[in-house]
Amino acid sequence: MLDIKLFRNEPDYLKGKVKLRGMDPKVVDEVLELDGKRRELIGKAEEMKAERNRVSNEIAEKKRNKEDADDVIAEMRKLGDDIKEVDTELNEVDEKLQYRLSTIPNVMHDDVPEGDSDEENIEVKKWGTPRQFDFEAKAHWDLIEELGMANFDRAARVSGARFVFLTNEGAQLERALMNYMLTKHTTQHGYTEMMVPQLVNANSMYGTGQLPKFEEDLFKVEKEGLYMIPTAEVPLTNYYREEVLSADQLPGKFTAQSACFRSEAGSAGRDTRGLIRLHQFDKVELVRFEKPEDSWDALEQLTSNAEAILEELELPYRRVILCTGDLGFSSSKTYDLEVWLPSYDEYKEISSCSNMTDFQARRANIRFKRDKDAKPELVHTLNGSGLAVGRTFAAIVENYQNADGSITIPEALVPFMGGKTKIGPATK
């Protein structure tokens, strides 16, 4: 959520930023109108409560002097009723204001390029060279079924479309990738490993920005009013919700592996085969809590931490900076890492690394003190995939396949695969 002071002090600047996000700049005027009404009602309520205190003192004085206070008591009752009416109106206006504020995205960093879609994202780095095959390469969804590593048909029978059973060496490879990523991030990158709840309440989803705007993308357990997490970013970021941290708790660096659940409401017809776009998938998440002055350097570090996985696995990738039209709701600046997938003959997103500045912290009320006597300030929160496990799985299968139908295990993964260096080939 944005600071209301930004609306009051820099409305024209904010209108320009909102317009680049594809929103009508009039939303800024709507917020200012509600804010003005709210402040007017607060002033009115305070005046009436001061008058009520004066009348209360007058009643007490009359009673001490054994004078008739009926008229003043009647005035007191009317004031009480009027105050209730004003408080009710104030609550209604405040609720409208908070809702309107909650639907407005973060202000993007000045580095973010203007654009309407992902086609206008800008490549800022490329690593590795896509492999040239001297045989007809297969798509990962075909190869893993031939090798007995996955079964999509049985998953569809059990759960529906966009689910998978990983079996035998497929399950082993998925587990190896998760263990490898967590080990790398904890032992070399300085993150603390967490195991997180995979059901969270609405306040947590609000804190990270999924609610109220993106409820249709979520799976909800209606009876309990809980949501299945779309990413471990949600519980990790909310770990410090409603807390004031000490300066020595920053930076806070956490990593967690979790299942992620997404309805993919707007993705009909896209990536319908394979592991790229499932309703349930595994991901290793990175989350950081930073002092405001440190967060932009932290974004570069976090992105490099995710890139280190791709480089050690020797998977060709590129880094792009998202344009205004593709930037996430809560993000001020995002780098996407895209891995080369031969079956698509293009790079596909495997990680998004973002600085949310104080946007999530304001919603979740996460603050810190520079010293014990200092005024609390909002932290900056950052997050990134380190990495999406299923997409890494797919990239390894496609980029490391051999002419005989086998898959070579990347050297970095061999210790996590029990020393195994190859999967397959399939036997008829």
From Swiss-Prot:
**Recorded metabolic or biological pathway in which this protein acts:** Aminoacyl-tRNA biosynthesis; selenocysteinyl-tRNA(Sec) biosynthesis; L-seryl-tRNA(Sec) from L-serine and tRNA(Sec): step 1/1
Using the UniProt record, give the first listed, main subcellular location.
cytoplasm
Q: Which GO terms describe its molecular function?
A: ATP binding; catalytic activity, acting on a protein; serine-tRNA ligase activity; transferase activity
Q: Which domain of life is it from?
A: Bacteria
Q: Extract the InterPro entries matched here.
A: aa-tRNA-synt_IIb, aa-tRNA-synth_II, aa-tRNA-synth_II/BPL/LPL, Ser-tRNA-ligase_type_1, Ser-tRNA-synth_1_N, SerRS_1_N_sf, SerRS_core, tRNA-bd_arm
Q: What does this protein do?
A: Catalyzes the attachment of serine to tRNA(Ser). Is also able to aminoacylate tRNA(Sec) with serine, to form the misacylated tRNA L-seryl-tRNA(Sec), which will be further converted into selenocysteinyl-tRNA(Sec).
This protein is called what?
Serine--tRNA ligase
